[in-house]
C-alpha cells in the first residue's frame, strides 16, 4: 500500500536523536521540517529535501510569530505530526533544565494551540530517568545461574526522579497531562546510543586508552536502545490507534550487566587488553561534587556532576516494554552487539576514533 506523504516537524533536529528522526522521515517520503535554533549546527541535516524551521522555545511571543510565518509559508496549514525531541541533558545551572525541558515544552504546546496548528499527534521524547532509583531491592529470578536481579520498572510505578534532568522531564509530562484536546504520546527511552552520540563515545575513548572505569559493588542491571530502534518507535507512535495520552518505555528488550557495553567496545575496537577499575560510590560522589561545583564557579559544563553520579550509581535500569509492543507494534531490531558494532564503525570512519 502506498504511503501518504505527511508533514512532520522535529524539534531539537540538530541533536543526536533529532537528526536521525529527520533523516528517517525524509527516507519515508515525508515532508520534514528540522526545528532548530538560529545558532544550531546543521552539520547532520544536509539531506536533500530538508526544510528548516527556526524556533525560539524560550520566547513564547517570538515562537508564536515564527509559527505564524511558517503556517503562511505552508499555505495556511500546520504539521500532521510534531516530534518534540528538543531538550537539555547538561546545564550549568539547574534552572536551565526547567527552562528548556519543562517551559520549552509548555511554550511549544501553547503556541501550537494559539495559532490553530495542533497536530494529529504530538510525540514527546521523555526519559526513563524520570523514575529514578526505584525497584532496587534484588529479587530472585529463575536464571541458569540463579543470580539475583531486579524487577523491571512499570508504567504503574510512581516516578521518583533523582536528577534535575529527570525532574524537568517529569514536570513536562505533568504539564501535558493538563492539556485539553491535545493528542500527545510520551515515549520514555532508556539510554540511547549510536553513531554521533557523545556520552557513550567517552567510554570508547576510555577503552582506547586501555581503561574501563566502573563504580559500585552492588549488582547493576542496565538497558540500552539503539537510536534507530527509538526512531522506528517514534514513527509507529504517529499512527498507532488509541494511544493518545499514554506513555511507553523503550529499550532493546534485553538486560545487561555493567561490563557488557565496555566488553563489546573492546571487542569491536580490537584492543588486546583493558584495565577494569571499579571504585566505591562514595569516591564517585566526591569527585562529581567537586567537579560540578568548580565547573559552576567557572561557568562551564561538567561531564561529572551530581546528576551524573546518580545516573552512574543507579543499579536498576530495567523497564517494561510490553505495552509498547502491544499498542505501538514496536519490536526492537538492534541488539547491543549489532548496535555497538555499527557505532564503532561510524566512529572510526568519521575520525572520532
Which stretches of residues belong to each language-model region?
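Substrate-positioning beta->alpha
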Residues: 167, 171-172, 197-202, 216-238, ...
